[in-house]
Amino acid sequence: MTHLQSGRWIAVLYLGVSLVTNAVIAADEPFRPEAGKFPPLEKAHAYRGELVFVDHANRRGSLRVQGAGGTYFRNAPHPFAMLPYGIVRYQGAPADLRDIPLGTVLHVRGFLPPDPKTSAVPVLPVNNRNKTAGYSGKGIAPAENHVLLLEDESSYCQRVGKVWNLKRVELKNNQGKIDASLQSKSSKDIEASEETMTFDAATRIWRGRERLEIQDLIDEGIWPASGKKSLDDQTVLLGITWKPTPSAVFTRFHISDIWLDDTAIERAARNQTETHKAFIRSRWMPAWVDAVEYGKFGSATVTATLFGGMDGSLYADFKKGSSGLMNAVESTLKHGHGAYGPAHMACRGPIIDVVRTDGEVPLGSSGIQIRFKTDLIIEGIRPGRVVRVRPGNWPQVNVPREEYLGTSTIEERFPTPAIFPKY
């Protein structure tokens, strides 16, 4: 594969090879984020697992975490919650939890709950990642279940500068196994361990602007119709999932996608970027409040930092002198206030300043601070609280009922089975 193109976001995400050793040491100690501060990525606990449940409206879900043991399929789902400024990446682009198919294997960088009293998922003992769970081994239920960065395999590889080298393929009846090793793009590790993964007729193969099938590779003589063949360390990016495996193999992952070149993964990233841009424009840009200057008769000037991880064109819409709306939200980014949606009770007014931070910006922050003036401030827009902001040129639409709060009850924040109608 030629040099993989990377977006501007990598400058924020990639902290440099020199930090790797320090990151490992720092990550050994559980870290709890502080209110009003973006936590350092190098202090996050790293793990990976299969997405098995999603509550997209509350930005939480469950992963089957890969532990030190060999019986992966026995590992119980482990709940996680996205931090308000937490970033989701899918196929090399910004994403929402709703964009990621169940079964996708994801890489996690997580922390302890910032405030255990308001956690949207169970709060576990601080040392829980060191506990052994039978044959599953250690690490399947870490207490660091509040996520700063959640990314699929292709996004992870692009961020850290790695690729998969395909060693050999074994094929029979349009399904089989591939042996591959994960390598650095810049240097080859001859001692890198190989991993065997399965594929089948549903595996998507992308080359340039084409989507190929296994039969296409057979017809071109690249893969055998049956049997084994060396792939000569072909460099690719992979999408990885998990499926039940025959032959009493307890832990073996499955290939959902193979991107054969830069063009293929760049097209996937562009498509996902457009999906996410449309989503954010309808749900508004998340931010947190740095300061509030109160004026007379309910007027106020709010200083807020926009959260990071979005496409640059979204931030470009925040311009000095343009109009905007600001609404208070939960730590789940679910809109509060309003009987029929976020615009009902939102503060209105002009954006009077936009300031971009020079230098390194922590993951989770955009490095962009806005000042917003309103003649009627609402409860919930206070320093340290999370808000969503809509520039005046974004469409005003009504979000679905499950994505905003009409009351402040715990039942509405986290619905129980009682929400179902009684027929």
Region annotations inferred by a language model:
Residues I10-N22:
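Bacterial N-terminal signal peptides
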Residues M1-L13:
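Bacterial N-terminal signal peptides that target proteins for export
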Residues S6-R8, V17, G338:
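Intrinsic structural disorder/low-complexity segments
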Residues T21-Y85, Y90-Y423:
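Short, flexible, surface-exposed loop segments at domain boundaries
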